[in-house]
Every structure is written in structure tokens, then in C-alpha cells.
Amino acid sequence: NLNREVAKLNYRIHTDAIQEHLTVPELTQSQKSFIYANEADMLNVVLFGKTAREWKNENPNKKGNMRDYASIHQLLVLANMESYNAILIGQGISQPERMEKLHDLAARQLNVLDSVNLDDLPQLPDIKKE
């Protein structure tokens, strides 16, 4: 799924910001993992309304995680949220304030994207390698 792969690449930008600004060398690997998971769950709550664990508990028979079942619009907004959160982390903005800003961003973007008919967008030509 190309959309999921783009989101994964953008996640790297997000995790680099977390590593640079929210962790210190003195933390154990377990403590660092908690910080990364906490940031990922904040994005999940803002976009999907629940943590990864809550989603998994509600969907025990589904493989993967909630992001694997996200719409193209949700994945695009998630990628944008990760980039924006990385910037906000770099600016030293607290998590509650970042959460509020990210919620506003997600709501605006989903509203715009939900009004777009993908069939109305220009299509790229099908280029086959020979």
C-alpha cells in the first residue's frame, strides 16, 4: 500500500524529532520506547479518537494496526500531522498544546479532503518501462 509506505517514511521525520528533542542519553531503552509510543498514541487519539491498544482490543481479529485500515485521507493527514508535530517538538511546545494544534490541523484537512472527489483529480499517465 503506497499510502501506508509514505506514512512510514514520514514517521522517520517524526521519530528523529522525538529523539533529538524529547529524549536524553541517560534514559533507558524502555523509557525511550515509552516516549515514542506516547507520541504515536497522541497522534492516534487526535486522528482516530483512540489509542493503538484501544483499537486492538476492539478489533482482536484484525491483523496489523489501525493505521493499516486507515483511509487515504486519514493517511495523508497523519503524514502531515507527523511533519507538523516534528516542527512543534523542535519549537519546544508542550504535548497538550501540540495536541490542540494537531487536532485543529486534522479537522481542517479532513474537512477539505472529504469534499474532494478523487475521480475529479487529473490522472497521471500510465508509463510502462520497456
Regions found by a protein language model. Give the residues of each.
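Positively charged, phosphate-engaging catalytic surfaces used for nucleic-acid and nucleotide handling
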Residues: 1-130
